[in-house]
Each structure stands twice: as structure tokens, then as C-alpha cells.
């Protein structure tokens, strides 16, 4: 389902090249420095950022029923990121040629190098330690079961997710309908946000360049408002704290080093489809709105601790 949702929003599926990425008994595999790894969900963004190494997104999916994903899983994902990002295709001829001081230019195996960003999707949440570790190492955490469409989707699929008695075409239609009202944002700390439009069946759009965020309590989704449209999204508590804290620090630094009459802002990138075409937009939030979100987050934390 995760793969289908992201493709519906506009991400591109990565096809196996039969060498660096290949199809194995466990599914799609990706080569690493130490070994090959199973790729649960492997995608490319609809548009790459100019002047940077092209990126791909690898999502590890965990379904532990009621058990939260712990530190061991997220720590393993960090190792996975290091292993696949440090992989290089080199043969003995290249190694021998490197020993010659008057050698010709050495061309390694011809393939496009990618920087892989990692995320973990869970249907049962994450422990506090896992969240803190992920925030430190910029590993995105997705609480799939807290997305607005989750309960509806589970009712359609049935409780036994391993034995789904539903036609593939029908499932694709359902996912396409849901994803047509969704966007994906990437925050300044690398966290993925699934934005679900709350304005009925209206098409996803971000009319202005500014947004505001709010939430009622830790058991409910966050709300992002842009123009006259509202989007709900999930965010693990400790990740939310890290995001707001970093955004406030970012604005503070801009105030110190940039002389401008305009208010400094913190930015994030949003990917979505409009009229069946991919769109990328940068949204900004100012210090006052961040402080309001921080205040609400602190109040919720104090209530829980009291």
C-alpha cells in the first residue's frame, strides 16, 4: 500500500537493472558494501534537485501489530543507509590500474550514483528511544496507522492483512482515490509528512507560499493550513519537538547573519499532483506560528506528565 500511495502522489517506482538492483526471492534487492539488502519500498522523487547527487527513497515497512518499533530497528536502518550509500562497483582491473603513477584516467563502472534517504513506516508507532535516534540521524518515521484514511482502508481490506480477499484492480482504484487528495512534504530535518486534504473532494493545491501548523492533543493528527485548505498529517511526538526546535534555531540563525527587512522563515518542500502533472513547491512558516505550535506542544507534554 505504501508503494501505491507514493506512486499515486507522483513518486516514481525504481525498476531493477539486474546488477545494482535486482529481483531476488525476497523481492527487490539493492547492493550494499557488505551485502545485498531487501528493498521494501524503493522510489525516486518526481523531480531531482539541480546541482545535487540524485536521490532515492528507501522505506522499511514494519507491521508489529501492537508492539512499537524500537531502537534496534532504527539503528539497523542507519547501518543500512551507510552500507548502500558507500557501495561502489569496482573490479580488479581498476584496482590494478590505480597502482600506476602514470596511469590513464580510470573510469569506474558506468552507472548513476544515488544518495539514498531512509525512512521507517510502522503500523504500531515508535518507542521514544527510536524517535530520538531517528531525529538525530535524520531518519524519517511514518506512523501509517495514524493517517486519516487508515481505519477506512483496514475496513476494506479486512483485519487479516496477510489474507486479503480483494481484487488488485479494486485496491488500485481505492488507493488512487485516496492518494489524489494527498501530498508529501519533506521538512528541513528530512522528515516525510503525508498531507491529507480535509476539504472534501477538492483537488490538492497550495495557493500561498505560507503555512501554519496546529494540533489538539498527542492522540490526534496535526493540521497544516495553507490558504483556504487544511491538511492533516501524523508526526511522532519527539520528531515534532525536534522539527519545531530546529526550525526555531534556523530562524534565529538567519536573524543573526542576514540583514533584511523581511521576516526570516523556515521552509519545507511539498510534492503533489495537479491536473495529472507533478508539482513541487516550497512552503514557509514564520517564527510567530512556530512559537504557537511550540506552546501547544509544551502544554500537552505538561498535562501528560502531571
Question: What residue spans do the PLM features occupy?
Answer:
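Mixed-charge (Asp/Glu-Lys/Arg
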Residues: 1-306
Amino acid at each position: 500500500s505504501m508503494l501505491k500511495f507514493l506512486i499515486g502522489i507522483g513518486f516514481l517506482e525504481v525498476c531493477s537493472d539486474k546488477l545494482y538492483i535486482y529481483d531476488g526471492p525476497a523481492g527487490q534487492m539493492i547492493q550494499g558494501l557488505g551485502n545485498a539488502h531487501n528493498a521494501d519500498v524503493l522510489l525516486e522523487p518526481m523531480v531531482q534537485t539541480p546541482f545535487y547527487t540524485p536521490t532515492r527513497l528507501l522505506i522499511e515497512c514494519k507491521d508489529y501489530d501492537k508492539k512499537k518499533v524500537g531502537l534496534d530497528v532504527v539503528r539497523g536502518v542507519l547501518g543500512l543507509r551507510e552500507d548502500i550509500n558507500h557501495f561502489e562497483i569496482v573490479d580488479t582491473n581498476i584496482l590494478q590500474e590505480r597502482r600506476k603513477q602514470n596511469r590513464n584516467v580510470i573510469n569506474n563502472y558506468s552507472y548513476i550514483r544515488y544518495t539514498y534517504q531512509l525512512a521507517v513506516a510502522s503500523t504500531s508507532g515508535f518507542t521514544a528511544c527510536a524517535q530520538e535516534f531517528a531525529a538525530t540521524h535524520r531518519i524519517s518515521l511514518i506512523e501509517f496507522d495514524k493517517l486519516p484514511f487508515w481505519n477506512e482502508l483496514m475496513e476494506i481490506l479486512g483485519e487479516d492483512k496477510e489474507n486479503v480477499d480483494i481484487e488488485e484492480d479494486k485496491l488500485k482504484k481505492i488507493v488512487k482515490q485516496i492518494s489524489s487528495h494527498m501530498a508529501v512534504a519533506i521538512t528541513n530535518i528530512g522528515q516525510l509528512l503525508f498531507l491529507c486534504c480535509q476539504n472534501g473532494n477538492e483537488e490538492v493545491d497550495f495557493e500561498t507560499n505560507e503555512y501554519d501548523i496546529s494540533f489538539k492533543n498527542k492522540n490526534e493528527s496535526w493540521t497544516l493550513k495553507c490558504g483556504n485548505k487544511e491538511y492533516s498529517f501524523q508526526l511522532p511526538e519527539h520528531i515534532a519537538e525536534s522539527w519545531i526546535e530546529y526550525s526555531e534555531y534556523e530562524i534565529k540563525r538567519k536573524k543573526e547573519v542576514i540583514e533584511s527587512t523581511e521576516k526570516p522563515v523556515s521552509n519545507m518542500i511539498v510534492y503533489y499532483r495537479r491536473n495529472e502533472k507533478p508539482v513541487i513547491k516550497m512552503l514557509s512558516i514564520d517564527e510567530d506560528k512556530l512559537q504557537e505550535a511550540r506552546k501547544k506542544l509544551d502544554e500537552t507534554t505538561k498535562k501528560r506528565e502531571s
